[in-house]
Amino acid sequence: MCAKYIIDACKFLVKTYHIDGLRFDLMGILDIDTMNAVYRECCAINTDFMIYGEGWDMPSFLDFRQRASIGNNAQMPFIAHFSDRFRDVVKGRTASNEVNVKGYCSGALYLIDIMKNCLSASCTNEGMEAMFANPRNVVNYVECHDNMTSWDKLKECCKEDSKDI
């Protein structure tokens, strides 16, 4: 019943407001079949339709294999996921207990091979195992509405560095 409501609501938005895409917050709590159905039904209305969202693996009553999470992105070939891998490699870890963990851009140069992977949309095995089969499945970002801004993160994790660096 919930899946039907989500699908019908999305179709209504596409038909009524002529939107061409949706962003799903906490998409990982929804199931793969529902997300694929949303894409399929909305694409039938607007062939340029796209979906992207937060594919975090959230606690849920669903088995992991059914969740619309980033780890299951291969089962959602037309849906993109925000890449926390890219964010963490570029900026450094963002959890409140990891604010001092640097990323490549803040001086962790040992991450160069993983950075190459990230710059290839995590679609190659350069530096680490590929996460996505196609660049259309990933949204690379460094900053959004969550956690510290890049400036605040740099100030915190690089406070011991000299200004010459």
Residues of each region from the PLM?
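Conserved alpha/beta catalytic core and glycan-binding cleft of carbohydrate-active enzymes
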Residues: 39-41, 48-165
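The substrate-binding groove and active-site-proximal loops of carbohydrate-active enzymes
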Residues: 1-3, 20-30, 155-165
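Broad hydrophobic/π-residue packing in well-ordered secondary structure
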Residues: 5-6, 12-13, 17, 22-24, ...
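Substrate-binding/active-site clefts of carbohydrate-active enzymes
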Residues: 1-17, 27-46, 50
